[in-house]
């Protein structure tokens, strides 16, 4: 993201973005005044739905790991999830991290038990298998639904010792350039460039915390102001919202305000 794009309001970027998913997301963020994504790594449908009833008003996006839901069913899990997304006006991002050849990910995305392409606005993929992964996922989406879908590439990770950096990150960016309409951005800790070639990538950053600096399993947290200053568009927060002793409604509003104020400061709107 260039300095010019970095200081533009989300609504301005929505006006010219080639992806309908990105346009919808940017406009939603402006309408709700939030750039918060809730990461709901919970293992039952009830836990997920109950949490979203509490944080739904404060988020633009929910990030799911649907394959850890022990009682998953399309009717029992996805239908009410979609209803909550409509009720509270947020989008859905299934954090699937696809990492196989194009033909395989095509089947994984559109079929199986989860039918991800049918209900998730956004998903993500590693670049390790090359650009065929983008082609396969896009084809799957087009075969399953008329609704627009978007893909994030995993350029950088927030865990200690992650090898997604340097040359790997550079090659992942090159893969992203192969499809301007379907690839909407990155999971990353920093800007990924591209603006000089006409790309406006959405940067979503995990590992954001207002209180904790890390955990025992290698997660490293950065503050909201830190990540926003390095080009993040959407902050991804999980345990900071619903960890032990936390009130999700209170924390949701707290992170929403922190993220939005950091965005307003970056875009000179304060």
From Swiss-Prot:
Residues annotated for substrate binding in this entry: 41, 63-65, 95-104, 221, 239
Keywords tagged on the record: Decarboxylase, Lyase, Pyrimidine biosynthesis
Active site: 97
E.C. numbers: 4.1.1.23
Molecular function via GO: orotate phosphoribosyltransferase activity; orotidine-5'-phosphate decarboxylase activity
Segments crossing the lipid bilayer: none
Recorded coiled-coil stretches: none
Alphabetical list of PANTHER family matching this protein: OROTATE PHOSPHORIBOSYLTRANSFERASE, URIDINE 5'-MONOPHOSPHATE SYNTHASE
Family membership noted in the UniProt record: Belongs to the OMP decarboxylase family.
Name of the protein described by the UniProt record: Orotidine 5'-phosphate decarboxylase
UniProt organism field: Candida boidinii (Yeast)
Phylogenetic placement of the source organism: Eukaryota, Fungi, Dikarya, Ascomycota, Saccharomycotina
Gene: URA3
